[in-house]
Amino acid sequence: MKKGLFILLALIVASSVFAFTKGTINPGGTVSFTSNKPNSDEKAITMFSITPQVGYFVMDNLSADVLINYTYEGQSESDYNDEYSLSNLGLGIGGRYFYPLAPGEIYGGLDFLYNSFSWEEEYEGGKYDGGRNAMYLGLKGGYLFPVVENVYVDFGLKYQMGLGDYGGDDYEDAPDEYKKNEESTFGINIGLQIFFSK
């Protein structure tokens, strides 16, 4: 047991030489694709999401981030539901703190995202489209596993919760109880991160 703890401690101390230094630039991001069937009789809902981000290390191991999120979701018509599509574009800022843990890095962070949604639904006899705006606070953590020098695979977890009220034309005349943004999302993602040091 003592040998195992000593080896783990030695790896943690040795890995501290791989800290990300002030001035490092970090482009990266994640891509995801999911297909979901709400029940066995419905057509699948297809969702594609891309989330690029750029970070700048304002001090050793502390990154300030700019985030972009684009998501598309769609479902084709079936006997039980109409055809619809939804797209979402989000812009945000955030930060992450990194800690060396051999052979890679663990991190934790926080971000603030402003999203703009638009949707279109086709049904017998017509078409409906609409949209809304919303704000979100996200907590995230993960592990960066090194692939080659300065390139890491990002295994992450994220929890996102809604802030404030929904905005947009569809919500101007809505009752107050329908305006509250009480959404919450938990996700697992994988991505690629690159680090360019000065």
Predicted regions and their residues:
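Cleavable N-terminal export/targeting peptides
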Residues: M1-G23, S197-K198
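Gram-negative (and chloroplast) outer-membrane scaffold detector with strong preference
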Residues: K22-N26, V31-F33, F48-L139, F145-V151, ...
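Hydrophobic transmembrane alpha-helices
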Residues: P38-K43
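Internal, hydrophobic beta-strand segments that form the core of beta-sheet-rich folds
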Residues: G156-Y159
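Short, solvent-exposed beta-strand-terminating loops
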Residues: G162
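Solvent-exposed loop segments that connect transmembrane elements
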Residues: D169-D176
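Individual transmembrane alpha-helices with interfacial aromatic-anchor signatures
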Residues: D176-T185
